[in-house]
Design a protein with these regions (language model features):
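Alpha/beta-hydrolase-fold enzymes
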Residues: 11-137
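Short alpha-helix in the alpha/beta-hydrolase fold that links the catalytic acid
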Residues: 40-44, 183, 197-206
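C-terminal alpha-helix
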Residues: 237-245
Length: 246
């Protein structure tokens, strides 16, 4: 049955969302455990001001020339906590800003979120190890990408942020929903992924409520582009798995 809550500022759910048909099978391919989690894990918590993409708290800067790699456990723990605090700060601002915009007779507005390519796992290959190249991210060299203008979540509306990226408000976190999935499930990871890591895949596997659960690791990067035949292998794997059940 539906498991949704009205978004911020609304009292009801969009009716069409309640009419979506249930699935027969669950398949995830190089999937992360939800948009709020992946964006938070990627974001740079050393940003001091959201209005200044060059502002840096040096105690949290993963690209500081004096920062030793591999990172210390203390730094990793502090960094992860700071990432979640940054997400929460943006969420609190977005709620307040929605109230201000609505009070002025409008519905929404756009804003930018800088520096979203700074997952420590993109820099330090000893954290959550797999066969990925490092330092690397989906846009190449992490520091260059982090200070660039391209990236998932870089431009949002206030309502998009709360609906899609906010740790506290978004319903796009996978964990609360995965336990409700009892149908047969196939979880595939790419062993050279530089943005979705082994612990992300384990989180999905551990959260699923399916008893018929198959996991598989493919050789290749996130988009299965680097190795010839990788996408064919994925298609064959999925096809055979589905045929075994229908």
């Amino acid at each position: 049955e539906p498991n949704l809550e009205p978004e911020y500022g609304r009292t009801s759910i969009v009716p069409a969302a309640m009419e979506l048909p249930g699935a027969d099978l669950y398949i995830s391919l190089a999937a992360h455990p939800g948009r709020p989690e992946v964006l938070t894990n990627w974001m740079d918590p050393s940003v001091v001001s959201e209005d200044d993409p060059l502002s840096v708290d040096p105690t949290l800067d993963p690209f500081d020339e004096e920062r030793e790699i591999p990172f210390t456990k203390e730094f990793v723990d502090t960094y992860r906590q700071a990432q979640r605090r940054r997400n929460d700060r943006i969420t609190q601002w977005a709620r307040t800003e929605i109230d201000r915009v609505v009070a002025a007779g409008h519905h929404d507005r756009l804003f930018t979120t800088p520096r979203l390519w700074a997952d420590l796992r993109m820099i330090d290959g000893s954290i959550d190890p797999n066969n990925r190249e490092f330092p690397s991210c989906y846009l190449g060299e992490p520091q260059r990408a982090n200070y660039g203008i391209y990236g998932v979540g870089t431009v949002s509306s206030l309502r998009t942020w709360l609906s899609m990226w906010s740790l506290s408000d978004s319903q796009c976190n996978a964990a609360p929903h995965l336990a409700r999935i009892k149908i047969p499930a196939l979880v595939i990871e790419a062993d050279g992924d530089s943005g979705v890591f082994p612990s992300d895949t384990r989180a999905i596997v551990d959260a699923l409520g399916s008893t018929d659960l198959t996991t598989h690791t493919l050789e290749g990067d996130h988009y299965l582009r680097d190795r010839e035949g990788a996408r064919d292998d994925a298609a064959d794997l999925i096809t055979n798995w589905v045929k075994d059940r229908y």
